[in-house]
Amino acid sequence: MPSATTILSDLPDDVRLHRLEALVVASETLQRASGLDDILHAILDLVSNQLDCERATVFLRDRRTGRLHARQVTGSTPLDIVLEKGVGVAGFVAETGENVLINDVRSDPRFDPSTDRRTGFLTRNMLCVPLRKPEGTVMGSLQAINSRHGDFSDADLAYLASFGALAAIAVEREQLAQEAVRAQLLSTELELARKIQQRLLPPPGRLDLPAPFSAWGASQACYDVGGDTYDVVMLSSGECGFWVADVSGKGIGAALLMTTLQTELRALIRMERDLARLASELNTRVTTVAPLGTYATLFLGVLSADKGRLRFVNAGHLPPVWAKGQAASPTEFEASGMPIGLLPGSFYEAGETEFPKGERLALFSDGVTDAENTSGETFEPAGVINAHAGIRTHEVEQIGPAFFEELDRFRIGAPAKDDTTYLVIGLD
């Protein structure tokens, strides 16, 4: 079609001057407008006034679904209009990027009369142009409906296209500004979530426990927040309770479930001595709040210094390893139940074993065993055992850092793909 400048030159001088002045005013108005709704309202007021039409509409594309949503409509009460991809004139324009002028909509197959039927409005003629980003992507469409002076002209269409170009720039600018605000809010929320998590987890390093217990732990989140958790608590019985849990998934969702899990565990371990019943109750509580398909593996132990015995329950978690230097070896603490939160009504079996004085037990999440090096090889449970076998000290505050050094040496600079949690428990 001819350019806007060419068509404007065909208009009478007074009309041409008026329209050019209106475009300048439109540009200034859109630069001053703040907020997407204000920008869209300003666009439609300008279109309605300059083209003297009964109704004007801005449609914006939903980037997720591809549907068009009528964000602003003039000449009526706000309408909830949603168009599937390619439906109606607005949908056609958004898909093809073409400018459309129709002076008899009933004779044009692109026109969709369903909105008229819903509202009682009678559409006679219309103009529709794409809202195009600077790089060419169409973000929506701009419509002018029912000229009050008869038919729309090519000059009207070119004029609306000029408004559409200004509107697209303003909308794109505002959407980018909104995305920046959302990103900042998300960053703030992530930082808050990270701080909350840090308060729920023990501080990394040696944990403050009465003799003869000792422990060292650390958890490194793959993202700003993680789904792994661990803790060590002294019980009124004089026993030492401890656990490592790994929530499925990563990021905010996993962190929320981790928070629930940590809070519930701290309460239940002080109320319920039977670890099988404790795990069942924990599973019940978690399944009521966790989204479907979200779960956590868990190894939970209670160590008695007087008896030299360890009671434990394993809910789908990796078995720990004995971590005393050259005597490092796998344990037989295999899973005795489903992961926590996976299935309502799950039952668990508790186990018990000897825990000699001087022994060390290492617990870890699958971020350890699944760690990859630059060749794509994984650390595996065997890597955990071999790493401990090479550590010559028996002090937990030295075992922990030495183990992470071995893990980092294996990775050779490859980035972590999952949260990494490690806890070593000792009885002296």
Q: Language-model segments: which ranges?
A:
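A short, aliphatic-rich beta-strand micro-motif
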Residues: R124-E135
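… and, occasionally, acidic/histidine-rich disordered N-termini of signaling adaptors
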Residues: A177, V181-A362, R409-D428
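Acidic/proline- and glycine-rich, intrinsically disordered low-complexity segments
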Residues: T77-V100, V105, F333-S336
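Signal-transducing coupling segments at domain and membrane junctions
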Residues: R67, S76-P78, N103-N125, N146-R148, ...
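Short beta-strand-to-loop transition segments that serve as allosteric relay/switch motifs
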Residues: T6-L8, V73-S76, S141-G150, V171, ...
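Amphipathic alpha-helical "output/dimerization" segments
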Residues: A22, P134, D151-Q175, T259-T263, ...
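GAF sensory/regulatory domain recognition
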Residues: D45-S48, R55-I81, K85, R106-S107, ...
